[in-house]
Amino acid sequence: MRKKRLLSRISFSSLFLLCGTLLSACTGIQADLRNLIKETTGKDIDLSKAIKTKEGKKNIIASLKKSYEVNPRDTTKLLLDAWKQSFEEGKLGIPDFDLTM
């Protein structure tokens, strides 16, 4: 049972890391993320600078986790929008999928 909990925590953190990295490339979503983090944590993070450092990435992930605890619906929507945009632009490193319709 503990292995399952640990695995889900690791998977959850990996999802936030992936989405946090993807958000750095999406300027429209970047503004939404900045506002969401500011509303839920009170921190005003410069994402373009924070995403370039290991400590900055940790801060973004921690802020996203806190934001998810406070406002799961908006946080999830933002992360899924960022993932979708990055996927459509081919920034996920999965070139074999073509989702354009």
UniProtKB/Swiss-Prot annotation:
Signal peptide: 1-25
Membrane topology: Lipid-anchor
Lipid-anchored residues (N-palmitoyl cysteine): C26
UniProt-listed InterPro entries: Lipoprotein_3
Any one GO cellular component localisation term in the record: plasma membrane
Lipidated residues (S-diacylglycerol cysteine): C26
Highest taxon, organism lineage: Bacteria
UniProt family annotation: Belongs to the MG439/MG440 family.
Name recorded for this polypeptide: Uncharacterized lipoprotein MPN_467
Species for this entry: Mycoplasma pneumoniae (strain ATCC 29342 / M129 / Subtype 1)
